[in-house]
């Protein structure tokens, strides 16, 4: 990648545990630099990195590792704006933000607010607030267009993350799993089980894929009624070392149960895999003759999803069309309607959604909502 002119940014996932300390993060930064990283990114996936700790971490990385440091956080807990200012003052070379229509909640802090907060300081980014306002006005329209598809929970601040430290995306997955099992009333038990499973697995940071590995096992432990009464395949692979070396030691009893059935591996897990790109290209070109390497990589990562996507695309159901249908259906279901004087004539939301080709997607949705309000 670097030979092709790219820049290698290596990520340090911020988390807290008995094995995650300032010194351990700096040591990881040194290892990443030795591997050839051009810059470091501190990823606060849960949005619970306090301003003072963020500042201390960035300052230590800049001074002791010597690489530029980017900070990526989320507004989930409400601290992100304060944390961003603290890390900039500590020497961060960049922070990730989002334009105000898409900021806050599970997203990043607003670009405009931080530009205003840093104006006149040594870290002034010299961005035109007027131009940013124009961009925000445009994307506010985009936001309204897709509002029917938004999960309102993802737009809100959740200070509870400061105590349970379960990132928003992971919490959504837990809710979905419990809803499927008709067990939403046991969410508190699962939330309490998550840190126990995480400790058993050596305190991995709760970020994809380990957040799903920990979360699913926590759900199993609660619903089965016995801890590790059923061990998921992903936990077994993790314990055996197929996801790399854990930050801390794995629970000895759990390790013994897993490795008694299949031995642990040593070394780099990817070295156990045979080269597969040529095979993937052959398989994907059986579906799409003109497929390139990018298509093959998509197929390799998500084979079932890719096949479904290609089958839908062949029928004309491209992402744009599917989005329009979803917008129409959700908009029809959510639109406020006055009590009718007489029984209304049945209307098919699908037939309405199929009329998107008569005009732009946004124009059709606006017209559809106007009809619903009449």
Question: Where would I find each of the regions flagged by the language model?
Answer:
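Alpha/beta enzyme core
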Residues: 1-69, 85-92
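Intrinsically disordered, low-complexity regions enriched for glutamine and histidine
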Residues: 22, 70-72, 355, 359
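Catalytic alpha/beta core domains of metabolic enzymes, predominantly
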Residues: 45-229
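Terminal or standalone catalytic/regulatory effector modules within metabolic enzymes
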Residues: 156-160, 169-374
């Amino acid at each position: 990648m670097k030979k092709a002119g790219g820049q290698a940014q290596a990520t340090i996932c911020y988390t807290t545990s008995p094995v995650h300390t300032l010194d351990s993060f700096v040591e990881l930064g040194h290892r990443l630099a030795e591997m050839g990283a051009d810059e470091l990114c501190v990823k606060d996936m849960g949005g619970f990195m306090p301003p003072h700790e963020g500042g201390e971490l960035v300052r230590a990385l800049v001074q002791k590792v010597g690489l530029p440091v980017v900070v990526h956080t989320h507004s989930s807990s409400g601290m992100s704006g304060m944390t961003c200012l603290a890390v900039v003052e500590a020497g961060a070379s960049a922070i990730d933000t989002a334009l105000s229509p898409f900021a806050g909640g599970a997203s990043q802090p607003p670009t405009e607010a931080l530009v205003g907060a840093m104006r006149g300081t040594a870290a002034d980014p010299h961005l035109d607030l007027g131009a940013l306002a124009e961009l925000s006005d445009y994307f506010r329209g985009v936001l309204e267009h897709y509002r029917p598809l938004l999960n309102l929970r993802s737009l809100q601040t959740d200070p509870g993350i400061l105590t349970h430290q379960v990132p928003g995306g992971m919490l959504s997955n837990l809710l979905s799993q419990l809803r499927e099992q008709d067990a939403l009333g046991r969410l508190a038990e699962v939330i309490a089980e998550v840190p126990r499973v995480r400790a058993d697995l050596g305190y991995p940071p709760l970020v994809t894929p380990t957040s799903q590995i920990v979360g699913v096992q926590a759900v199993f432990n609660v619903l089965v009624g016995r801890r590790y009464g059923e061990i998921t395949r992903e936990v077994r692979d993790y314990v055996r070392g197929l996801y790399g070396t854990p930050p801390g030691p794995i629970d000895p009893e759990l390790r013994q149960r897993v490795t008694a059935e299949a031995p642990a591996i040593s070394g780099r897990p990817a070295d156990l895999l045979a080269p597969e790109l040529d095979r993937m290209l052959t398989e994907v070109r059986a579906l799409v003759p003109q497929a390139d390497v990018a298509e093959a990589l998509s197929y390799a990562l998500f084979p079932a999803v890719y096949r479904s996507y290609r089958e839908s695309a062949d029928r004309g159901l491209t992402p744009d069309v599917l989005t329009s249908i979803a917008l129409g259906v959700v908009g029809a279901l959510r639109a406020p309607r006055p009590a009718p004087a007489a029984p209304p004539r049945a209307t098919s939301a699908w037939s309405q959604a199929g009329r998107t080709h008569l005009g732009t997607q946004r124009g059709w949705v606006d017209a559809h909502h106007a009809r619903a309000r009449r």
